[in-house]
Every structure is written in structure tokens, then in C-alpha cells.
Amino acid sequence: MATTVKSRFPLLLFLGIIFLASVCVTYANYDEGSETRVPGQRERGRQEGEKEEKRHGEWRPSYEKEEHEEEKQKYRYQREKKEQKEVQPGRERWEREEDEEQVEEEWRGSQRREDPEERARLRHREERTKRDRRHQREGEEEERSSESQEHRNPFLFKSNKFLTLFENENGHIRRLQRFDKRSDLFENLQNYRLVEYRAKPHTIFLPQHIDADLILVVLNGKAILTVLSPNDRNSYNLERGDTIKIPAGTTSYLVNQDDEEDLRVVDFVIPVNRPGKFEAFGLSENKNQYLRGFSKNILEASLNTKYETIEKVLLEEQEKKPQQLRDRKRTQQGEERDAIIKVSREQIEELRKLAKSSSKKSLPSEFEPFNLRSHKPEYSNKFGKLFEITPEKKYPQLQDLDILVSCVEINKGALMLPHYNSRAIVVLLVNEGKGNLELLGLKNEQQEREDRKERNNEVQRYEARLSPGDVVIIPAGHPVAISASSNLNLLGFGINAKNNQRNFLSGSDDNVISQIENPVKELTFPGSSQEVNRLIKNQKQSHFASAEPEQKEEESQRKRSPLSSVLDSFY
């Protein structure tokens, strides 16, 4: 028996070794993926686990929670990144990188949104974006509204119809589009243009001449205008309302002498070479300077000087004027790079010494300026005033041009009563304020003459909401009425002004309807002559009146009783 056991011992030993090996393999598979730990570490891990279980449910600081959550997010992000690589092994490397960047950006975005300061910045950015979009939408709606007004009313030119010819930090020059390009109605206006100038304090429009007659009117500010002739020079102190004619080809320059207020000037331009087109010829140091156009021989012979000296003194661009160089860089449109530049206070004082004020005499000379407001107004009451200069003998400047100049002031809530001009075509510029205009014409008035037989002669009302810078054309014979929603200041240029007559359709004075004889009134109107006369006499004011009828005013005053005032406070 002992011999048998001894002979089988190696076999039993071998089987025991195999059993132990299988046990070890099974244990190893069970612990796969975990870190290798020594017995001491395993014991410490067990103890820490027990401690963690004891702490479970206890209060933890917020920063520990945030750090724990952040670690979990990072772990999830890395795990998703790894799984994405494993699931899509066949994708291009750049595609995987894009996906990784997107996931990472989303994770960073979530982190930023959790930051209170970042959330505030995001809210501010979103509010600013909404505000910008709202302003843009309002601007587009206003532009569409103005375009719609112009489409419905060919007599209205909104302020955005001015084209900027020149602009820099010192001011700008703008020209209104041609009248005859808008409609055949304005065919007789093809040789008239409107130009607006604006200059900052202590600036100068440098010397130039234009191939057009100009009627210059100061809208705002104070200026010094110098007008040159072959053997003379005249300088004038100009203020608001001053008007002067500058004949075609006259060299002149204009200075804003005020310390604070911008200078605003408007020119009514009558070209002499080509209908509706004019050019400015300047003497300042730019490529539009007309002296540059002459040949060297002509310049040397004319000035009896070598060309090098002429070029240095008259033609070379100077390097001593950094302000002008900055203006050139800031110029946005046009080629007149130095049209408006800064001028020193000392230079202004020197120019001011020789300047005369506008004429206050009743009979101004042919070349002196006159002020629209220095004479008695044509019409005046508590609702408004109209000042007007007509081409009569006492105003010889306007005689050869057959143009009148007028200034209309309508107080807030007032109305210039319906009227029409017998001969004059009026170009009306809104200088200040807002209001409404109603102009009467005929339907399809813009059609060609050959279509007149088929044209409907029904009366058409054209309406316009007036804002500063807007221009309205009022043809002769077309009735018009203007109301003011704020104090309204208008400047008018009337063409074909000689023997023009303004006929009012309502009011106690200058009312053409009141002059109709009674028998004709009965034939003309549905009511009797007595009813017509009584109706006409209801308006006690002349030329200007309240925009609200007296009956409505009385009703509104009755409604504003103490009881109604108390009740209104609850609504």
C-alpha cells in the first residue's frame, strides 16, 4: 500500500499544481482592470471606503461639490471621446478632430454659462443684439415709409435724396437730386438745383467759383462771406436769414466765425452752361485746382516767373498742414479734398475787421446781402409769419433771375390756410420742425400730354409728413395747406415770381372765394349765397389759424371740466 501511494505521489503533486494554477487564473480574471495593490494598500482602501460610507449624507462644502461635478463632467467628456473613437474607427482624422472640438466647445460653453459674470455678459450681449435689431427694423420701416410717401407723392423729396459731394470732419456739401428726373411735372425745373453746406466752428470753405448764379441763404450760424471782383473785394458778416446773390463765375469764400454753433447754408443754383449741371473751380492745393491745367509755358509767361517757383508757391502740396492731411484721409466722397479746413481764431479776427453787416436799408445795393426778417412780414398773427423778398425794383438782385425768396414760420398747432400761387413754382425746404402738408392736384397728372383725352381729371390729394431737410415742390395753381406739429420753419424759392399773386381759399382777408358775386356763388356751390358767405365768415383769422376748429376747441374745453379731469387721472 505504501508502495502504491509512493508511486502515485508525483501524479497527485502534478494534479495539485494544476488545481492551484486554475485557482490563480480565476482570481486574476476577477480582478482584471483594477490596480495592483499590495495587502497594506488594500487594507487602507477598505478603511477609507468604510469612512466614506460613514460620511455619506453629511454636509460638504459647495466648492467640493463643484469640483466633484467638474471632475465627473471631464470624465464623461473623456469617456465619450474615447467611445467615439472606438465606434467610428473608419472616419477621417480631421472629422474626428472636428467632432472633438465641437464636444469640447459645448463643454466649455456649459462651464461659461455656470459662471455668474459670464451669464451677465451673455444677457447684456443678447439685449444689445435685440436692441440693435429693433433699431435696424425701425430704421428700415421708416425708410420704407419715406419711400412709400415719395412713391405716392411725386412732389416730396425726402432728406435722404441729397447726395453727399464732399464730407470730412469739418463739414459737408450735399446736392439734391435733379427735380426733372423725378417727374415730367418738373420739366421747367431742370435748370434749378439745391445745394446744402454745413461747417463746424472756425472752418472755411476755400476760394472757388461756380459756373452758375447762386442765391445764398444762411439757415443757422454766423458767417463771413468774401466776394471778389477784378478790382474790388467785399466782405460781409452774415447771420440767420441773410440772403445774397452771387453771380456766376464770382470767386468767393465763406468762414464760420462762430465759436460753438455749426454754420448751415443753402444755395439755390441756376447753371449757365448746361441745364441742371454746374462745376466748381477751386484754387486750393488739390488736383481740382484749375491753375494746374495750364502748361508750363503759359504759367511762366502769365506770371513772369520760372515754373519751379510757381509750382512751389501755388501748386505744390504743402507739408505744414497736418490738419489738412487728416482731412484728406477722412474724406469719404468727392475729389475736392481740401474744400473745408480749420482756420485759427487770429485769422478769423483779421477777416472780421473788414467785414460789413448785411444791409438794413430799405433799398439795398445790387451786390449787398439783405435779411429776410429785417422787414415787416407780409402776413403775421399769433399763429405764424411769412417774410418775403420779391423781384421788384427795391431788390434788384432778384430781378434778372425772376425769383422770390420767402421764410415761413408756423407755430406748433397752427395752420397756414389753403392757398395757391398764380405763377410761381415754389421749392420749399424744411429748415426746422415737423408738420404735415396737403397738396391738391389731378389724378394721373404725370401722364404724357397725348394721354390727356383719356385722363381722369378727378382731384387728387397728396400728403406729406414734413421733417428737417425735406423738400416739397408746389407747382403754380396747386392749392396747398401746411400744419405744424412743432414750431415749423420753412424756406421757399419761387420761380416765375414776377407778378405772382398768392390767393387764399379761406380766412377773413385775401380770400378769393369771398370775392365771387352772390349769383355766381349760387351757381357754383350747392348752398345758397347766404350760406356760403356765413360759412366764409366763420374763420376770423387770416393767412394763419389754429389747426383745430374753434368748435372742437370749445368741446375739448368743456370736456376738461374739474370732474372730467379727476376721472381722467384714473385712466
Curated annotation (Swiss-Prot):
Polar residues composition-biased segments: 562-571
Region (Disordered): 33-153, 320-339, 539-571
CDD domains referenced in this protein's UniProt entry, alphabetically: cupin_7S_vicilin-like_C, cupin_7S_vicilin-like_N
Alphabetically ordered keywords of this record: Seed storage protein, Signal, Storage protein, Vacuole
Segments forming domain Cupin type-1: 154-311, 370-533
SMART domains, sorted: Cupin_1
Signal peptide region: 1-28
Record-linked InterPro entries: Cupin_1, RmlC-like_jellyroll, RmlC_Cupin_sf, Seed_Storage-Functional
Subcellular location(s) per record: Vacuole, Aleurone grain; Vacuole
GO cellular component, one term: vacuole
GO MF term (any one): nutrient reservoir activity
Residue ranges, compositional bias (Basic and acidic residues): 40-96, 105-138
The UniProt record lists the keyword Nuclease: no
Main function: Seed storage protein.
Record-stated family: Belongs to the 7S seed storage protein family.
Matching PANTHER family: OS03G0336100 PROTEIN-RELATED (PTHR31189), VICILIN C72 (PTHR31189:SF41)
Protein name: Convicilin
Organism expressing this protein natively: Pisum sativum (Garden pea)
